[in-house]
Structures are given as structure tokens and as C-alpha cells.
Amino acid sequence: MEDYALTFGINPFIALMIQPIVTMTVVDNQGLGLPVDIQHKAKPSPKASQMLPPDLGPPSFQNLLSPSEKLEPWDPGMRKLTVQTCGLTFIHPAGHGLCHPTAEASAETLSSTALNRPSVREGACNEKSTENKKPQDSVLWSHSRWFQGN
């Protein structure tokens, strides 16, 4: 209320005195003698997760605890990665390199067609392009070493 009073040039003390009178008049059922309009009852809109197909919806505890649907037979171009720390399983295309330090430090369980592929080693992303070589962050490097040790 004080902000409006300063905007319109009214002394804040006077505005504070007027505020309870205005509030009582507006809140009172017959204060201004105006008819009370019944507002339309708004229906709650569905959440975005309810509108998505089940396979695109957010993960739920039920999906995490129940055995997930298995993709059989494995596509030769896919790899199954299992992260030891949280027990999640990710399917990753074999054509894309694993360039994130935590991803390359995770334990890999490969499908039968991908058992003989070379594993991703540290710095493999930087070896591909020499022109955009950036120094590796020491914090990420230390975390990748920690993940490899566990």
C-alpha cells in the first residue's frame, strides 16, 4: 500500500490510515452495494506428465523398483551401461563417444556383440580433434579418478 501511496503522491501515514477503511469496505458483503458475481469454477488442467505417453513420462518409484522391460535381442549398435553408484541402466548408441568423465568411469556391461570393442579411456574425446583441445578441469579429473577407484 505504501508503494502505491508514494507513486500517487500520498503521504504514507495517510495511506496507512486509509488502508483498513478500504479493506473493510471491499471485504464487507454489502460495503459498496455491488452485486457479488459468482466466479466460474476453474477445472484443474492436467499435468504435463499426464499428457505424455507412458514411455515419455517421468520416472516413478514403481518403474525403478519393478523389473524394466528388456530389449531383446540387442541391437548390435547399442551398448548397455550400468552405473554402480545408483543402479540405473542407460542404453547408449555405440557410434557416440562417452566423453563425460563420470560416464567413462562407470562400469560397462556390454552386449554379446560388443564384448570385443575397445573400452573408452580417459582423454579419448580430446584425441579426436587437436584443434579444439581444452585443458581438462582438475575437479572433473579428480572425480573421474574417484569413480575409477570405487
Curated annotation (Swiss-Prot):
Disulphide-bridged cysteine pairs? none
Region of interest (Disordered), ranges = 118-137
Q: Where is the composition biased (Basic and acidic residues)?
A: 124-136
Gene Ontology, cellular component aspect: membrane
Q: Name one GO molecular function term.
A: vitamin transmembrane transporter activity
Q: Coiled-coil annotation: which residues?
A: none
Superkingdom is Eukaryota
The record's similarity note reads: Belongs to the reduced folate carrier (RFC) transporter (TC 2.A.48) family.
This protein is called: Putative solute carrier family 19 member 4
